[in-house]
């Protein structure tokens, strides 16, 4: 069954430079309204970040697509997400790889996302309530790490949890934020600036 709103969104993403067909398909197939409150359903396929409670947001589809594309994922890529939030980005990733690990510092968001993802028949996702600054060392190393909140500086724990050749996508900064792509080469980390972005802050610690 076709979804005209999702088709319009995918057309918008293509017009704005998203080229990876697997990423476009993952976004087309995912019902974004399932990750939003009933009051937000009419905006589900707009290219906007929307509130999900606890001062957090679901990222705009463009930035989800852009960051996912930049991770250069293969089916067997080991992926860590920092900031589960609603679970939307998690679900996009889970359509592209065998397994996704995701850390969320706010317990209620983690539980809601876990329930929502199971309802949507995603069983290749492991979520954890914890401090995103620390990553998930027991599951490391990772081929790709994606951070969905802005850090004041790059968390060293995340760099150390990258495989050689692994990619880290992270927004860095306070009010003025840059989306960085960092690639590990042995003990060196090569960083490139992708574009200016606006994310909620990556706060250390965890909330019950």
UniProtKB/Swiss-Prot annotation:
Statement: the UniProt record of this protein carries the keyword S-adenosyl-L-methionine: yes
Gene Ontology cellular-component terms listed: cytoplasm
EC number: 2.1.1.77
Localization in the cell: Cytoplasm
GO biological process terms held by the UniProt record: methylation; protein modification process; protein repair
InterPro entries with a match to the protein in the record: PCMT (IPR000682), SAM-dependent_MTases_sf (IPR029063)
Broad class of the protein's primary localization: cytoplasm
Active site: 59
Keyword Methyltransferase attributed: yes
Pfam name, any one: PCMT
Superkingdom to which the source organism belongs: Bacteria
Reactions accelerated catalytically: [protein]-L-isoaspartate + S-adenosyl-L-methionine = [protein]-L-isoaspartate alpha-methyl ester + S-adenosyl-L-homocysteine
Keywords: Cytoplasm, Methyltransferase, S-adenosyl-L-methionine, Transferase
GO MF term list: protein-L-isoaspartate (D-aspartate) O-methyltransferase activity
Sequence similarity: Belongs to the methyltransferase superfamily. L-isoaspartyl/D-aspartyl protein methyltransferase family.
Function: Catalyzes the methyl esterification of L-isoaspartyl residues in peptides and proteins that result from spontaneous decomposition of normal L-aspartyl and L-asparaginyl residues. It plays a role in the repair and/or degradation of damaged proteins.
Protein name: Protein-L-isoaspartate O-methyltransferase
Taxonomic lineage: Bacteria, Pseudomonadati, Pseudomonadota, Gammaproteobacteria, Vibrionales
Protein encoded by which gene: pcm
